């Protein structure tokens, strides 16, 4: 077992391990096994993650001995993710559709600034990244689960999204939100491994406090995250301030109702000494009433949380819609009048079908139609 994460068991796993799934200490262990000097591990990490390099094959690691490169190629895979489509937006938000090595499709979204996360304008470039292929949690308003759940992403596939977007755009990502396809905390071990690579000085070097995980409400995993050493931020996809409303649109609420979820949140805030964010998608005639706003204010005040209001991004084939701008503003005003720090997300991506999973679903259906 390595400090801060589970070690890869090289003897049990038959398939090749991707080189970008390894922590530096694991690389150092393999380097020793190959009877190479310890500094070779750092050289490999530099080739993988440093901006000027970021090679895509072992052959490109030109300062490593040829025989050593051959051994690495025999021992490890070097997977790539391919960009299938990029959709731009008039507000410069861009959505990326990736094809993985096994043919599965996933999405990421590049957001040039994320005021709703910080409460003010920001020059940061944020990537909204995926953690699973599809989703098993079946939120009624979300496109990610419409085609079901396929598998968890490996650590390297999570990290690769960030590097692929940086490579394509030439822009440095300095903020990551795991709010794309999938339930991040249902892929806990792979995600923690990926975050350690993203956070490490030898990796992508992005500070833990610039990394936010979102969860639909897996109470045990929230408590597990609270006991992790990583100081990442946590956002709760709440979307309903009562069990009645939340249960209509989020099946997870039947397993972990608000009492269980909020108890886990309370444990998290006491352990981490961090402020939570409640993500709240405003859906017309479902969860946008003044009563829901008042009840949400009570919950947020109790936990010292801030609220990020998100007007619903419509999904083809689903009946939901966003409230009027006036209703959105009224909901926000009730929260603020109740003493809750709250923001209403500015329009970013509505014109590029930026709802989670929508581009993947449209592309898959188009391919199925073309081949049927």
Question: What annotation goes with each model-predicted range?
Answer:
Residues 43, 132, 158-161, 328:
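Glutamine-centric residue-chemistry signal
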Residues 114-157:
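Canonical Radical SAM [4Fe-4S] cluster-binding loop centered on the CxxxCxxC motif
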Residues 164-343:
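Conserved AdoMet/S-adenosylmethionine-binding subsite of the radical SAM
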Residues 89, 130-131, 214, 237:
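Short linear Ser/Thr-Pro motifs
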Residues 94, 106, 124-129, 137, ...:
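Generic beta-strand structural signal
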Residues 1-106, 110-115, 266-275, 282-372:
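Auxiliary Fe-S-binding modules of radical SAM enzymes
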Residues 146-175:
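Conserved alpha-helical substructure of the radical SAM core
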